[in-house]
């Protein structure tokens, strides 16, 4: 197995030349096994670097089978030799958590940046691409992949292992990334010094599963009929109605009817625009895989011994606050539980910049430099 630096695109942070680390032993069964780890030279360089790690041939998924992709890709940001923070987001998130010149704003630029709550002058940040892989050069699979949050956590562990990360100072996971953080804490109880879980619980809520099930059937219908773009757009429209609250929709959109039946209402125009914008962000097969992974998610809270901070929103319909309260009751080492209302519902972690910034700043303030 090799560790490689790839994609040396220019960013606002200084980048480095491509390099390859010494080969590491193969064997998916050995991921995360406690051993002396020597920090990779990549951790000793400032700036943004993509890192690719080969996936062992014996890396088996929880429900059987193997990955067709050959590597897992992460991206390092921030200060060399600084405490490392892992950041993971929803199923639309990727390794570009921070802005770059070619990609524009990262998916969480409001929280990750120079002098931001997750301060790149103070921390080293690692984000990674979830499996199955996606990109212009990746052929879409004919069938969805059955993958769990534990599988994703083990892929992350491959990156950490071969970067030589002895301790993760904090794993901050939001939505699907929060589920992965919980799975990581369950599988590797001593690797992360703390978990920060935002808008995620130990299991999905059945009503949220029902909504995602409708989205999956729309995607499957698109595959069967060859109307893939329309299916992705329509499924995204439905998803958008579950992310936000009725208060936000009520404040943003006029309920006045158009002049003729069959014409779009203003709120429908908005949803259709969001659906069209999402067509290039995913494929039906990948969306089916990750949507199913959310609904397959299960962890035993009692097995998570690392200190945990929970951040939940009382208006979140996808991850109801009651589920997070149950999680809080069952965690053996709950540090704090932040509960707030937001008109943005499940998307609050992306939209409530000041609120999230204040919480993260407080949570991370005592990490040693």
Swiss-Prot record:
Q: Name one Pfam family in it.
A: Abhydrolase_1
Query: Which Gene Ontology BP terms does the record give?
Result: homoserine metabolic process; methionine biosynthetic process
- Give the catalytic activity: L-homoserine + succinyl-CoA = O-succinyl-L-homoserine + CoA
Region feature (Important for substrate specificity): 90-93
Its primary localisation, in coarse terms, equals cytoplasm
Q: Where is this site: Important for acyl-CoA specificity?
A: 212
Protein's pathway:
Amino-acid biosynthesis; L-methionine biosynthesis via de novo pathway; O-succinyl-L-homoserine from L-homoserine: step 1/1
Q: Where along the chain is the active site annotated?
A: 175 (nucleophile), 316, 346
> What InterPro entries is this protein classified in?
AB_hydrolase_1, AB_hydrolase_fold, HAT_MetX-like
Q: Name one GO molecular function term.
A: homoserine O-succinyltransferase activity
Q: Which residues bind substrate?
A: 236, 347
Q: What class of enzyme is it?
A: transferase
Where is this chain's protein located in or outside the cell? Cytoplasm
Sorted keywords for this record are: Acyltransferase, Amino-acid biosynthesis, Cytoplasm, Methionine biosynthesis, Transferase
Source organism, top-level taxon: Bacteria
Where do the TM regions start and end?
Answer: none
Q: What does this protein do?
A: Transfers a succinyl group from succinyl-CoA to L-homoserine, forming succinyl-L-homoserine.
List, alphabetically, the NCBIfam families matched: PRK08775.1 (NF006449)
**What is annotated about its quaternary structure and interactions?**
Homodimer.
Please state which protein family the record places this protein in.
Belongs to the AB hydrolase superfamily. MetX family.
Q: What is this protein called?
A: Homoserine O-succinyltransferase
From which source organism is this entry? Brevundimonas diminuta (strain ATCC 11568 / DSM 7234 / NBRC 12697 / NCIMB 9393 / NCTC 8545)
């Amino acid at each position: 197995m090799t560790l490689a630096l790839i994609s040396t695109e220019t960013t606002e942070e200084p980048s480095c030349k491509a390099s390859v680390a010494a080969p590491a032993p193969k064997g998916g069964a050995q991921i995360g096994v406690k051993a002396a780890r020597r920090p990779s030279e990549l951790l000793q360089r400032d700036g943004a670097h993509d890192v690719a790690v080969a996936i062992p041939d014996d890396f088996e998924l929880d429900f059987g089978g193997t990955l067709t992709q050959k590597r897992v890709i992460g991206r390092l940001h921030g200060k060399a030799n600084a405490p490392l923070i892992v950041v993971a987001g929803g199923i639309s998130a990727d390794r570009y958590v921070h802005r770059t010149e070619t990609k524009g704003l990262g998916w969480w630029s409001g929280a990750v940046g120079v002098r931001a709550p997750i301060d790149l002058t103070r921390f080293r940040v690692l984000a990674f691409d979830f499996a199955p892989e996606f990109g212009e050069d990746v052929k879409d699979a004919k069938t969805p992949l059955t993958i769990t949050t534990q599988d994703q956590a083990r892929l992350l562990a491959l990156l950490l292992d071969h970067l030589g990360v002895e301790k993760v100072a904090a794993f901050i996971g939001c939505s699907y990334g929060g589920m992965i953080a919980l799975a990581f804490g369950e599988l590797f109880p001593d690797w992360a010094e703390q978990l920060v879980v935002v808008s995620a619980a130990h299991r999905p809520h059945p009503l949220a599963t029902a909504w995602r099930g409708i989205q999956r059937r729309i995607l499957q219908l698109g595959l069967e009929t060859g109307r893939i773009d329309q299916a992705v757009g329509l499924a995204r429209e439905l998803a958008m109605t579950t992310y936000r609250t009725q208060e936000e929709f009520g404040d943003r959109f006029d309920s006045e009817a158009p002049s003729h039946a069959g014409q779009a209402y203003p709120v429908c125009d908005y949803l259709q625009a969001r659906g069209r914008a999402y067509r290039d962000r995913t494929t039906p097969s990948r969306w089916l895989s990750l949507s199913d992974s959310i609904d397959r998610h299960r962890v035993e809270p009692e097995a998570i011994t690392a200190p945990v901070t929970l951040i939940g929103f009382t208006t979140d319909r996808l991850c109801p606050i009651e589920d997070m309260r149950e999680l809080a009751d069952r965690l053996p080492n709950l540090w704090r539980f932040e509960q707030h209302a937001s008109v943005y519902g499940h998307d609050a972690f992306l939209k409530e910049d000041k609120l999230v910034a204040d919480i993260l700043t407080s949570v991370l303030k005592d990490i040693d430099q």
